[in-house]
């Protein structure tokens, strides 16, 4: 995950992951973000896309995932908790959005333990594994559309 990785869902939104810190000690940590277009919420699209991204990051050997959510946003918090994220803390009045300061919630998910191996850059992943992962979640997205 040396560079930001982004997954687009047609015209419905995107999700991406990027390094959370530059120091080598944090090579196995990533921050996730997701944006969904209006009308897409509440249909399982966000959960499906984030689950796919998490699986791809696990294939790369990442261990700790973090998500930052501008508050209030209970739907996003619930979705991430369903995926196994836990509350990690709140930064108060730290995000400027919509002409005002907002609290920002941090959530975390651990997807591995023990001594890590070097992270596998996305382009070095086995193409077959990537395609299997993407197909699994595309099938789920297609079910959402039906």
PLM regions: where:
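A conserved beta-turn-beta hairpin within the catalytic core of GNAT-like acetyltransferases
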Residues: 20-32, 41, 59-64
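Conserved beta-strand in the GNAT
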Residues: 10-19
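A short acidic/small-residue loop/turn micro-motif
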Residues: 19-21, 109-110
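Single conserved hydrophobic/aromatic residue that forms the stacking wall/gate
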Residues: 1-11
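Conserved acetyl-CoA-binding loop-helix of GNAT-fold acetyltransferases
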Residues: 36, 42-59, 64, 74-82
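Conserved catalytic-core motifs of GNAT/GCN5-like acyltransferases
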Residues: 16, 66-69, 81, 86-103, ...
């Amino acid at each position: 995950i040396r560079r930001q990785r982004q997954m687009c869902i047609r015209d419905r939104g995107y999700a991406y992951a990027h390094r959370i810190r530059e120091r080598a000690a944090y090579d196995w940590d990533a921050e996730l973000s997701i944006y969904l277009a209006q009308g897409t919420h509440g249909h399982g699209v966000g959960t499906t896309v984030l689950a796919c991204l998490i699986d791809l990051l696990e294939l790369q050997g990442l261990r700790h995932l973090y998500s930052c959510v501008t508050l209030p946003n209970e739907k996003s918090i619930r979705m991430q908790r369903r995926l196994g994220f836990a509350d990690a803390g709140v930064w108060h009045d730290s995000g400027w959005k919509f002409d005002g300061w907002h609290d920002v919630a941090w959530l975390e998910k651990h997807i591995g333990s023990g001594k890590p191996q070097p992270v596998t850059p996305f382009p070095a992943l086995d193409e077959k594994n990537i395609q299997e992962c993407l197909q699994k979640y595309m099938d789920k997205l297609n079910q959402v559309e039906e």
